[in-house]
């Protein structure tokens, strides 16, 4: 595998001015918060990559007491991206991510974005029929989920276009003391997946990227589709909501603009 080389990334800006014909009485109550912003005209992956290059040693997230820096996070994202390309994922393909708030969910979300695929985000506790509907609506070709949810996906697999099921495990991302406690409590309740099950275990999946010697990153636009989320279905059948790169990136910039006291390294 070729060693990656990086050059300083220049991200263009994009604005969405408020038309003069639109009445905005609430602007008078915003204080010092700007009414409009200059948004980064890039993908979700490019935004995270730029931050990781700028603050490599800063803590990106804390999971059950285990710290991960931006550099470590970006390394894992790129590793996943190469592995996705190795198993044949192409630009525009849908990848269903059915994970709780865990490190693998972060890695897979941004890896999916890096290669130009679309992340279909669903709740892992959804019922089988709901999962089947989400997979059919999105036409997903890959599912990433935890070991304890495997049986639900295998039960409806033949009714979908799923080619690969990638299995992650919570225990793999825990520190040693926490892992020991987890395996003595929640971990022991998980039904083992049969050794001959048609799945790709996370550790095996991570190693597949070593075979990727070509450019795995795909250049996309800020307003291209990036993520699919689902409505609650309170007024009818649940619907897939397609969000763009800039939908996510804008939210992060709006949070910072609304909280000017935030500084690199602060926790939220």
Where are the predicted features?
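A short N-terminal helical cap/helix-turn-helix that marks the beginning
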Residues: 5-20, 37-60, 75
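Short, contiguous pre-domain boundary segments
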Residues: 24-35
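Conserved AMP-binding/adenylate-forming core of the ANL superfamily
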Residues: 38-40, 49, 57-102, 106-110, ...
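A short helix-loop-beta submotif of the ANL/AMP-binding
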Residues: 81, 94, 100-128, 136-142, ...
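Conserved adenylate-forming
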Residues: 84-90, 209-224, 228-268
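Conserved ATP-dependent adenylate/AMP-binding module captured primarily in the ANL superfamily
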Residues: 124-159, 251-268
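ANL superfamily adenylate-forming
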Residues: 155-222
